[in-house]
Amino acid sequence: MKQHIGKAYDKVDSKGILTGKPSYTGDFVPKDALVIKVLRSPHAQARIKSIDTSKAKLIPGVEAIFTHEDVPNTRFTLAGQTYPEPSAYDALILDPVVRYVGDEVALVVAKDEATALKAMPLIKVEYEVQKPVLDMHTAIDHETVVHPEDDIHNNIPVGQDYKRNICVSYHKRVGDVEAELAKCDYVVDGTYFDQATRQTAMEPFQSFGYVDALGRVVIVSSTQIVFHVRRHIARALGIPATKVRVLKPRIGGGFGSKQTACTEIMTAFVAWTLKKPCYLLYDRTESQTCSTTRHAREWKIRVGATKDGLIKVIDMDSITDAGAHATHCFTTTTAGEHKSIPLYNKATAIHYGTEGVYMNHTPGGAFRGYGATEALWPLECAVNNLADKMGVDPAELRQKNLIAQGEQSLVYAPDEYLDSGLFQDTINRVKEMARWDERPHSWDIDERYRGGLGMALALQGSGVANIDVASVEIRLGDDGNYTLYTGSSEMGMGSNTVLTQMACEVIGCPMEYMTVVESDTDIVPFDPGSYASSTTYVTGTAAKMAAEELRTKIIAKFAEFFETDVENVEFDGVVATTKDGSKTMDIHQLAPKLLVGVKAEQLSGFATWGSHTSPPPFMASIAEVKVDKQTGKVIPLHFYSCIDCGTVINPKLARVQVEGGVVQAIGMALYEDVRYSNNGRLETNNLMTYKIPTRQDIGELHTDFVESYEPTGGFGAKSIGEVVINTGCPAIQHAIKNAVGADVRTLPMIPEKVFMAMDEKYKV
């Protein structure tokens, strides 16, 4: 019987957040901090010919104004990835070439925001405007080269050809696609488009910085990736990493947006240069425009099957809008391969490819789902179409082709297998939840509305195999309590609670005995940060191992004081006794004794862990919608989800993860769109124009779990944070198609698209 694993604890920081305790970056800004505001480009692509800041500098209270002439000329990447990261080093703190509307032109530093805003219009900039690259289909060999510079650096080749606006070119082929397609009895094909979407975290991007008494620049930021940010700052400023400290308070949401450095390098430059505290806060328009989005991608897909229902060919090719910088472009596009094609493991030939192109849009970056969301959208739609063409139940077709435990996919590494997965059980459970086999999948609700059901499956990963590792230290304090040190980032999902549960389960102590210290590069051991669904699987396993080491040391010390062998000591996490009960001592008595005298020793456990594999969590979903035949408006009624994420460490937090991901998926499917004008200006740059769903827009959410046991993960756990966003778009698309015959293949599926694609017999 587990003491903590599987228990639905509240988040350890929930009371402080609910009662308004200072928690976020903005709560800790020094009162004397200078304010940084950013002058931004009105053009999508231009070269700065001249900048005159003389009048602006005369405004009382203006401390400094910096342009591209004042900053180091060292290129870096903003992507939060373990070195050597594959994202191109194509950014400068300030660049003489601007590449999207909103790109940074100058930094205005003043005593307060009002003064900075007063000075900004007085800066005179002369631009040489170029024709922008705004269409992914014409980006390659466009007359405008988005990155004409010769000093872009790549750590590894990713098929780049910058003079042609190609930042990524990747193709994976196994088997002969054309030959195998010729043998198939059924083939479906199509072109699908998934739009750029915005993470839209509640907390905007912000950071403050200062130079400490040791002459080091300290950055406090809302970031998921403190160690990666430290490395990027050091490179950009040309200083040793030992001169940089990065720490984060609590984050008000990230969803991948804060896996990319945003404000931190500009803040660090100003603080380092002026040797004064400074603060940079993006407003909502800047947060929407000047960070990163999910990559927009257009797909061409072919799926072929034999008459006995075996999917033999999957052919997926795409073009990807990287935006102004190739931030995360290679890894998001290639990640989709590993998290889509393995679903259907009877295939004998596959092709997965993409060209990532530079464009004059907001840079693409990390967003929950990280490539899997994009790739599963066309694949799951195609599988549903294949089932329709074959006249079979789409659930039955999937279950016949699904990868099984112990199998190896065509796209897996030679030593990579599916070690755990109750995928068939997961599908069966979601079918029960939605009564899939007991009712029609399309029906009339009344004269105006029709209802429909739709299905989709999804995989994800758990960390980045063979690359990312996590280190955790747990110390026994002088009072008998414990401190867990981690570089992972709590950003609202409850990771500190889960790590505490895993560590306390090993030690055997109550949850209140453990405090978590996180995300301070001076204090905690290395962790790449909270991304790639890695925290529970990678950091959690390291926490379990560190706790095991510490527990062993504690028992050994009890044995010393009892003058007996360790085998004769029983320790329940608080009290130790000899097996005969003759001697007893609790941890609060032991701890201070360990820190007195010449043989004093503070006990700690330490572990570093990474995995050769990235075990996939699995999700099966059924969407139920009603469609207005007069307008094409889609109204979500129910969304049923069943997830295999291995052992569920905390059911309450896991359920919240599922619900949050599903809500974001509904937003991507029906409402959200990063939309640009003809000259490249972002039109959906605030929360009035960029529509995210509210509680009234999502229907009822139904969630359940099927628990497999992952042998490589701590307590059998896999990830859950990202897979939950991957089924919404194709499941809702399938439900719409079943309801009114509208086969909408571009996201979002807004009423106009649905109505135009609706079967004529349903239109009112």
Indicate residue ranges for each PLM-predicted region.
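C-terminal catalytic domains of large/alpha subunits in multi-subunit enzymes
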Residues: 69, 238-243, 273-279, 307, ...
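Short acidic, glycine/serine/threonine-rich loops at helix termini
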Residues: 75-80, 119-122, 230-232, 255-261, ...
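Flexible, low-hydrophobicity surface segments
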Residues: 1-159, 187, 273
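Thiamine diphosphate
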Residues: 231, 245, 252-275, 279-280, ...
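Glycine-rich loop/linker segments at domain edges
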Residues: 7, 13-19, 83, 88, ...
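Catalytic phosphate/nucleotide-handling subdomain of diverse soluble enzymes
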Residues: 462-524, 538-539
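Helix-loop-helix junctions that connect adjacent transmembrane helices in secondary transporters/permeases
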Residues: 146-237, 402-481, 611, 683-697, ...
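Extended active-site and interfacial segments that coordinate phosphate-rich ligands
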Residues: 15-16, 121-128, 132-134, 224, ...
